[in-house]
């Protein structure tokens, strides 16, 4: 009789434990992909086969689960930029005990959505973000949106370079002006003298000489 009572109590305890169901689950497959944007095929990193990755859409208050599978030959990660969440779910390797995701392994992010707005997610490992591992993240209001609109468009801007990010970083370490193809020449100085006079042209040249960027440098990486 006592044995039956114990089994009955155990059954009651098990059935009373709440089952935690997640409101939304996404699976993100990180893998290399050959892409042609400039007319040449180059190796980049895609999420679920696309660059940028898929738009992740949530609703305020949802409990979400995101499974990230690493099919690269190096560690990877996903950081949820601007999202309020537990530290261990932030996705920055080396912080809050998160080691990153090893090749061939997966990691499941679980957190509750506590805000609304337009955000983005991206790798926080090496230069993988620059190589294509990023995407948009939209969080809708739980109740009616305070702003009326006919249609919601998501615009995600990004630079693209045929070189991989590790090569770009190595080149910039050799010289911060490595990609500065339109550098000023002596001819430009004479043109400035003709237009503004020698004194102003000389002072202008000295001023730029003290700076870390050239006047023709519109971006860190060009071409």
Language-model features: locations:
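Cleavable N-terminal signal peptides
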Residues: 10-11, 21
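Histidine-centered copper-binding motifs that mark active-site loops
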Residues: 23-223
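Bacterial N-terminal signal peptides that target proteins for export
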Residues: 1-9
């Amino acid at each position: 009789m006592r044995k039956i009572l114990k089994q009955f109590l155990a059954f009651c305890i098990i059935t009373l434990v709440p089952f935690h169901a997640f409101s939304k689950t996404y699976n993100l497959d990180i893998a290399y992909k050959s892409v042609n944007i400039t007319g040449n095929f180059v190796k980049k990193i895609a999420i679920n086969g696309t660059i940028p990755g898929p738009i992740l859409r949530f609703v305020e208050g949802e409990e979400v689960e995101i499974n990230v599978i690493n099919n690269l030959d190096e560690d990877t990660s996903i950081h949820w930029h601007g999202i309020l969440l537990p530290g261990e779910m932030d996705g920055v390797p080396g912080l809050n005990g998160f080691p990153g995701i090893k090749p061939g392994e997966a990691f499941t992010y679980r957190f509750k959505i506590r805000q609304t707005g337009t955000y983005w997610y991206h790798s926080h490992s090496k230069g993988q973000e620059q190589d294509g591992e990023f995407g948009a993240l939209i969080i809708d209001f739980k109740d009616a949106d305070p702003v009326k609109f006919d249609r919601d468009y998501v615009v995600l801007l990004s630079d693209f370079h045929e070189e991989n990010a590790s090569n770009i970083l190595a080149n910039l370490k050799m010289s911060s002006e490595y990609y500065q193809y339109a550098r000023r020449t002596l001819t430009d100085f004479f043109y400035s003298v003709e237009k503004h006079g020698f004194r102003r042209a000389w002072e202008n040249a000295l001023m730029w000489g003290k700076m870390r960027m050239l006047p023709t440098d519109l971006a860190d990486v060009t071409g």
